UniProtKB/Swiss-Prot annotation:
This is UDP-4-amino-4-deoxy-L-arabinose--oxoglutarate aminotransferase. GO terms for molecular function: pyridoxal phosphate binding; UDP-4-amino-4-deoxy-L-arabinose aminotransferase. It is an enzyme of class 2 (transferase). It comes from the Bacteria. One of its GO terms (cellular component) is membrane. Its cofactor is pyridoxal 5'-phosphate. GO terms for biological process: lipid A biosynthetic process; lipopolysaccharide biosynthetic process; response to antibiotic.
């Protein structure tokens, strides 16, 4: 009898999350309100940030953060191509130009040294990515950005619970976390922007709710002020209390969730140590990995088949996989707009990346099942 399908990711939702949603539904206030306020306070306390603003998605958060910084036509924003397309999309939609930099072949993260070569007088911001749960090497980057007077916005979508040099990601500067369904903590869709810049926080809060001079939920009047006026055109990126209530429970569970992810990842690393598949390398500097993803590189010369054939073979064995990600500059729009971009290490990885199952409700037996499927696939390819 064939085994049931094992997805590459699945949210961990329990009775506490269900009870939290039920409580909000019965409260009579289901959109942005007290749950969202408490989530902001609790998340800021968790990472040691001065300000936290909840939003409906990390894409929306990146949009208003870049806009709040004044990014627009004629500006450049440096970011790796090896990431999800939303950052580059937002840069382009603001009329600015994404400047793509290469990554380390084995960690998939760029570096201050690579970024420095891309800085020009038009550089307005730098968006580094904490990849797959590992921390970006922040100290050299912030030193570089300070020398040039350039703002950094950390893409921390993969980094809930990640730490760098003993400090939680999000403690310094500005960072954006995602609460999408496959992330370490989720509320289906949602995000948190944290920052030590009070003016930026106020502008983001205004832009994410129609440009009104007050938030969707006024903390002083416990409602919406009737005299609220539009201070500038804005958007509708506020997070509902239904979602915030789930995120609050998930935040309380985050340490346990990440500990289970760590245990599963450690077992994968041990079992795949002598396999021709290539897991991502761990950064050499001090950091605490949140293990959002477990990524392999399927090199045809080592494995005897390419990534797509490998994924198809695992699917036939009822094992789900994912790709994180096809490099941004290789997507159709960006190929046409930036035909001369060449990023050798990014491109080498883009055709080889494969994410295998990793989520907190998995067991070590599930890991063994995945490893067994990988081994039988490789044996068949030879």
């Amino acid at each position: 009898m064939s085994q049931t399908f094992l997805a590459f990711s699945r949210p961990s939702i329990g009775d506490e999350e269900i009870a939290a949603v039920t409580r909000v539904l019965r409260s009579g206030w289901i959109t942005t309100g007290p749950e969202c306020q408490k989530l902001e306070e609790e998340f800021a306390a968790r990472v040691g940030a001065r300000h936290a603003v909840a939003l409906s998605s990390a894409t929306g958060a990146m949009h208003v953060a870049l806009l709040a910084l004044g990014v627009g036509p004629g500006d450049e924003v440096i970011t790796p191509s090896q990431t999800w397309v939303s950052t580059a999309n937002m840069i382009c939609l603001l009329g600015a130009t994404p400047v793509f930099v290469d990554v380390d072949r084995d960690t998939l993260m760029t570096s201050a040294a690579l970024i420095e070569h891309a800085i020009t007088p038009r550089t307005k911001a730098i968006v580094p990515v904490h990849y797959a749960g590992a921390a970006f090497d922040l100290d050299p980057l912030y030193a570089l950005a300070d020398r040039h007077g350039i703002t950094v916005i950390e893409d921390a979508a993969h980094a809930a619970g990640t730490a760098y040099q003993g400090r939680p990601v999000g403690q310094q500067g500005t960072a954006i976390f995602s609460f999408h369904a496959i992330k370490n903590m989720t509320c289906a869709e949602g995000a948190m922007l944290v920052t030590d810049n009070a003016r930026l926080a106020d502008r983001v809060r205004q832009l994410k709710f129609h440009g009104l001079g007050v938030d969707a939920y006024d903390r002083l009047t416990l409602g919406r002020k009737p005299q609220a006026e539009v201070m500038e055109p804005g958007f509708k990126y506020n997070l509902a209390d239904i979602n915030a209530s789930i995120a609050r429970v998930q935040l309380q569970r985050l340490d346990a969730i990440n500990a289970q992810r760590q245990a599963l990842a450690s077992h994968y690393l041990e079992r795949l140590a002598n396999s021709p598949v290539l897991p991502l390398a761990l950064p050499r500097y001090a950091q605490q990995h949140a293990w959002h993803l477990f990524i392999l590189r399927i090199d045809p010369e080592r494995c005897g088949l390419d990534r797509d054939a490998f994924m198809k073979a695992l699917q036939a064995r009822n094992i789900g996989t994912g790709i994180h990600f096809i490099a941004t500059h290789l997507h159709s729009y960006y190929r046409k707009r930036f035909p001369d971009v060449r990023l050798p290490d990014t491109e080498w990885n883009s055709s080889r990346l494969c994410s295998i199952p990793l989520f907190p409700d998995m067991s070590l037996d599930d890991v063994e099942r995945v490893v067994g499927a990988i081994e039988s696939t490789l044996e068949s390819s030879h």
